[in-house]
UniProtKB/Swiss-Prot annotation:
Name of the protein in question: ATPase ASNA1 homolog
Active-site positions on this chain: D64
Entry keyword annotation includes Nucleotide-binding: yes
Classification via SUPFAM superfamilies: P-loop containing nucleoside triphosphate hydrolases
Protein family membership: Belongs to the arsA ATPase family.
Keywords: ATP-binding, Cytoplasm, Endoplasmic reticulum, Hydrolase, Nucleotide-binding, Transport
Compartments where located: Cytoplasm; Endoplasmic reticulum
One term of GO molecular function: ATP binding
Binding positions (ATP): K35, G36, G37, V38, G39, K40, T41, T42, E234, N261
GO annotation, cellular component aspect: GET complex
UniProt xrefs under CDD domains: ArsA
Matches recorded under InterPro entries: Anion-transp_ATPase-like_dom, ATPase_ArsA/GET3, ATPase_ArsA/GET3_euk, P-loop_NTPase
């Protein structure tokens, strides 16, 4: 058995790297999600980079309104798939799901539908985003890429997406209730506002829901779709990761990878400082005073770092207790440099393929 592979009590073959993930050729959609600021985009880019070496064609699609793909690759991306510099088969695009009907991506059905239904239904919470995302995934489904990696919006947006079937059910229910309570007024309202007839509105909503059901069937197929959770060892991130994992489990969407990013390493410089001070005993009092001040600052920074590390270790222990033995957990150390540009991403991606267990607390 390889060093990075272990069999859990429940028979799962778990690893502390992403080799199984990137080598499973049946995957069509890989979603990467988590709290904002935990490094989702860097992980998404790195996974896409690795996949481009194994698959015929890869699309990296950002649905995060903040859009960091352009920053990560040092290259401007739009709502049209664009070849990433330094690659032959990796494409990237950025879409704002909350405004996707206004983009040039071709989601005209949602835009036209929202323009023709009564304003009463346009005000229903989540209708624009729900319908836009439904049509977006329909369009993505027809794209001819071997695999698509989704750099998703922060957890709250992702949870809203997972609740889309329920949202559309509620929209249909609301439509029927309002229509039954004030059918005559609805007809007059539609006539005055050039809205679609109620029967056509109802049928379109049903079609959106039917299409979304087909999409969710692919989402729930563990051979075609999986979700990668990214977190850092801090309270809010671990909390949101648990929320996301629970929601994925509730909707029967596969999630077997957790990447713990920005993990700090313990340092101890006290012995080095002491030895250096002893070797400099012949210095003048003035110079020795200056160096003592410097060493004091060094030890202060060490204590600050190790204090933060102690906090991280608490949440690393929580991660181990919650997920060890059930998930592939990969720990990525705090990177020394900013990860920007294709070469930096290729270098960073090597860490995902190495045996990287979470450290002992």
């Amino acid at each position: 058995m390889e060093e990075s592979s272990m069999e859990s009590d429940n028979g799962l073959n778990l690893r502390n790297d992403v080799k199984n993930l990137v080598e499973q050729e049946t995957y069509k959609w890989i979603f990467v999600g988590g709290k904002g600021g935990v490094g989702k985009t860097t992980i998404s880019c790195s996974l896409s980079s690795i996949l481009s070496e194994r698959r015929e064609s890869v699309l990296l699609l950002s649905t995060d309104p903040a859009h960091s793909l352009s920053d990560a690759f040092n290259q401007k991306f739009t709502d049209t798939p664009t070849l990433v510099n330094g690659y032959e088969n990796l494409y990237a695009m950025e879409l704002d799901v909350t405004r996707v009907a206004d983009t040039g991506f071709g989601l005209n059905e949602t835009k036209m539908f929202l323009q023709t239904i009564p304003e009463l239904f346009q005000m229903l919470p989540g209708i624009d985003e729900a319908l836009s995302f439904s049509e977006l995934l329909q369009s993505v489904q027809s794209m001819k890429y071997s695999v698509i990696v989704f750099d998703t919006a922060p957890t709250g947006h992702t949870l809203k997406f997972l609740n889309l079937p329920d949202t559309l059910d509620k929209l249909l229910e609301s439509f029927l209730k309002v229509e039954s309570l004030c059918g005559v007024a609805m007809k007059l309202f539609s006539a005055l506002n050039n809205s679609l007839p109620k029967e056509e509105i109802f049928q379109k909503l049903k079609r959106f829901k039917s299409n979304l059901t087909l999409i969710m069937n692919q989402m729930k197929d563990p051979n075609r779709t999986t979700f990668v959770c990214v977190c850092i060892p801090e309270f809010l991130s671990v909390y949101e990761t648990e929320r996301l994992i629970q929601s994925l489990a509730k909707t029967d969407i596969d999630c077997s990878y957790i990447i713990v990013n920005q993990v700090l390493s313990y340092i101890n410089l006290e012995e080095h400082v002491k030895n250096t001070q002893n070797s400099l005993e012949n210095l003048s009092p003035e110079n020795k005073k200056v160096l003592d001040c410097f060493f004091e600052l060094v030890l202060e920074q060490q204590n600050n770092l190790n204090g933060r590390l102690s906090i991280q270790r608490k949440y690393i222990e929580d991660i181990k207790q919650l997920y060890e033995g059930f998930f592939n957990i990969v720990a990525i150390k705090q990177y020394k440099y900013e990860v920007r540009g294709s070469e930096a991403i290729k270098e960073f991606s090597k860490a995902l393929l190495k045996h990287s267990p979470i450290p002992d607390s």
